[in-house]
Regions:
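Non-cytoplasmic
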Residues: 23-32, 235-265
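Transmembrane alpha-helices
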Residues: 9-17, 218-248
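Transmembrane alpha-helix signature in integral membrane proteins
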Residues: 85-117, 233-239
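Glycine/proline-centered hinge or cleavage motifs at structural transition points of membrane proteins
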Residues: 214-215
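Transmembrane-helix boundary motif in ABC transporter permease subunits
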Residues: 103-134, 146, 248
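Generic hydrophobic transmembrane alpha-helix motif, especially the helices
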Residues: 130-185
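Membrane-cytosol interface at the C-terminal ends of specific transmembrane alpha-helices
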Residues: 168-211
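Hydrophobic alpha-helical transmembrane segments of polytopic membrane proteins
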Residues: 178-186, 255-297
Length: 300
């Protein structure tokens, strides 16, 4: 019960923090005047809190292309229209959350499988793999996204077969390629971390004792070493999710994907921005709390 109350307090503090950050410009700017305006700032905060309590009344602005032909010239203009927040926001919200958690699961699975496999290899081969992975970690995320898009398009042009969808549209959203791209950097970081922890665990006395008992290296690694390693890895879950969120913002821009972050960055009403931020952050915060609970159970 105490932890539940603490979690609710954290969520309330998040809401207050988001609200103050979103309303901060009104503290210094009033129309075209620049100064220090406390009253409009507090009024904006009160309006945001009031609007959040009535989500059915929230409206979001969406820009749509409108085709016009003035003077026999075809012109496409962007026209902004207001729509109710629900159910319009549900599809981009589910898409972004699905990418985050899909990439998280993929990165954990790939890191676990690759680290166990690499730990079983001879030392010379393991050193080569670790060096190659260290080089991959220096590759910027934007470059990797462009490279994957160009690779998919090049394969399609040469063999006339579209392996993965390189561009996301509202009618045909790209799923597999974004998950692979988003999981790239977290997989490498987890892989390096797990290899380091495995090497440290292999120096422990219980590993020497298990080898003396005649247990195989695979059995010792999976049954004893990895159980201790996974507990330490759970301490880095927040970092992994933070990397995924920042990469998701870059991905939505480069893939022209209509996700929740692109909506937040498109200049919505302050109350809508705060509500969408909470809608996006709370599930991620819930996963962090769940993994912390699992870690405590493992220690117990």
């Amino acid at each position: 019960m105490r932890k539940l109350i603490a979690s609710l307090v954290h969520i309330c503090l998040l809401m207050v923090t988001f609200t103050m950050l979103v309303c901060l410009p009104t503290l210094f700017v009033d129309g075209k005047d620049v100064g220090f305006y406390v009253k409009p700032f507090l009024s904006q905060i009160a309006n945001v809190f009031s609007s959040i309590l009535h989500p059915s009344q929230l409206k979001m602005t969406i820009g749509t292309q409108v085709r016009t032909i003035p003077d026999h010239v075809e012109v496409f203009a962007v026209q902004k229209r207001e729509y109710p927040l629900f159910p319009v926001v549900i599809k981009p919200y589910v898409y972004s959350i699905g990418l985050i958690f899909g990439a998280f699961v993929v990165s954990v699975l790939l890191a676990v499988i690759s680290s166990i496999g690499t730990a079983m290899l001879p030392r010379n081969i393991r050193i080569i793999i670790e060096g190659f992975v260290s080089i991959l970690k220096t590759v910027p995320d934007v470059f990797f996204i462009f490279f994957m898009q160009l690779l998919v398009i090049s394969v399609y042009r040469n063999i006339d077969f579209l392996v993965l969808n390189p561009i996301s549209t509202e009618q045909n959203p790209s799923i597999v390629l974004p998950i692979l791209i988003l999981s790239f950097l977290p997989t490498i970081s987890l892989f390096q971390l797990q290899l380091l922890l495995i090497r440290e665990e292999q120096k422990q006395d219980y590993v020497t004792f298990a080898r003396a008992r005649g247990f195989s290296e695979m059995y010792i690694l999976c049954k004893h070493i990895f159980r201790n390693v996974i507990v330490s890895v759970m301490n880095h879950v927040q970092y992994i999710l933070l990397v995924l969120v920042t990469n998701l913002l870059i991905f939505e821009y480069l893939f022209h994907a209509k996700g929740i972050l692109s909506i937040i960055m498109s200049g919505q009403d302050p109350a809508v921005i705060v509500y969408l931020l909470l809608l996006f952050i709370v599930p991620i915060y819930g996963v962090v709390l769940f993994l912390q609970w699992g870690k405590e159970k493992m220690y117990a």
